[in-house]
Amino acid sequence: MSLLYIFAASPMEGEPVRKIAEVADSRSPARCGANDVFFIVSGMGPRNARKRAEEVLGVRTEPSVSLKPDSVLVIGLCGGLTESLPEGRVVAYTACKSTEAAKPMLSCSPTAVDQVVTLLVSSGVACDRAIGITSPRIATNRQERLALAESGAAVVDMESYSILETAATAGVPVAVLRVVADSLDRVLPNLNRALDNAGGLDSRKALRVALGSPVRTARLLTANKRAMQHLTKALEIILKAPCFV
């Protein structure tokens, strides 16, 4: 039995975990097949994710959860940076970079990645290995995504690197499983205008952006919903399996 901490940026991205593991009490782990799991909402953006991971894993402070995990799993949505990754494709990170040039690339657990990818593919779920990059800003169009792709990354998110970095300090291996919600050519509403100082969304500003771009916002929400269906299917398979021993 492995103890697994699962991080997602938002309750929406973590909803599959709540359903699969029947998470009811955040103070105690939920049994899920071969794993006991804690679900943690990190918040959106690198700063929020780092702060929450440090709290939970006991880096710089006493841990908010008393049990040290065997592994950490980061889940959620990501943006595709290459033509080869369509919307709805599940990706397992082999490593993650930061848009901060001085920071080194961090590797995910090779054992967990191999087990997750092998299990998903054998179960009929397409899952690509990919290098991710974490950015404090939302990549809203092809030009911005191609600029990020120059780093060698194939997908972008806003939290994974911060959690990987913190977990490395705590001596805990990490796997990252995300799903492509917006492909290389999708144009998103400019929600960067709604980001607060910590990198999260200011709800009032986000509403104004949405009202100013109603069609793009509707398409974004629809794409996110479709992507989460693919991620849910993948999580239903791996969360009950011994992938994180």
What are these regions (language model features)?
Residues C108-P189:
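Active-site rim beta-loop-alpha module in soluble metabolic enzymes
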Residues A9-M12, M44-K51, T111, Q143, ...:
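Conserved active-site and cofactor/substrate-binding residues in soluble primary-metabolism enzymes
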Residues P86-C96, E144-E150, N190-D196:
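Short, surface-exposed, charged loop/turn segments at secondary-structure junctions
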Residues R18, R50, E54, V117, ...:
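Predominant activation on well-ordered alpha-helical scaffold segments within soluble catalytic domains
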Residues V180-V245:
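Regulatory input/activation interfaces that engage signals or partners
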Residues M1-G124, A154, T169:
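Metabolite-binding pocket within alpha/beta catalytic cores that recognizes anionic/polar moieties
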Residues A8, V72-G76, S160, A175-S183, ...:
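Glycine-rich anion-binding loop/nest that anchors nucleotide
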Residues P16, Q115, Q143, A147, ...:
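Exposed alpha-helical structural elements
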